Amino acid sequence: MLEQLKLTRSQKLLHIILDPDIEELGSTIPLTGIDTYLVVLKPVKDLQALGATLAHELTHVAQFVKGTLQVTARGKRWRGKFYGLKTPYLDQPWEVQAFSKQEILFRRAIEV
């Protein structure tokens, strides 16, 4: 998946953990002070769902690395446009992109 997202040359650290207490299926947290991205996944028995969630979160890592997605104190900036904290989840363009890529990234990863 990292190759498909063109992240193989990134100098950032990627840390992936499983946390049964996380509310959502996955979350990506940029730790900008230490050039690290933390991906937290909820462990589920459905490995296909877990793989798709990982692909979704790695898409967010790619968005952060490329600078198209940035976190601010009042929301997020996507390709230069600001989106406040109250922007509905499915109206956030970075989420739309991640959902559109997650299945194909996961399917390509398991073909190898």
Give the ranges of each region predicted by the language model.
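Zn2+-dependent metallopeptidase catalytic core
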Residues: 1-10
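Short, solvent-exposed loop/turn segments at secondary-structure junctions
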Residues: 19-23, 44-46, 68-69
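Post-HEXXH active-site segment of zinc metalloproteases
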Residues: 48, 64-96
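Long, well-structured alpha-helical subdomains associated
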Residues: 88-91, 97-112
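Short pre-active-site segment immediately N-terminal to the catalytic Zn-binding motif
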Residues: 37-54
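Active-site recognition of the HExxH zinc-binding catalytic motif
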Residues: 52-64, 98
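Juxtacatalytic substrate-recognition/specificity segment
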Residues: 14, 18-21, 31-39
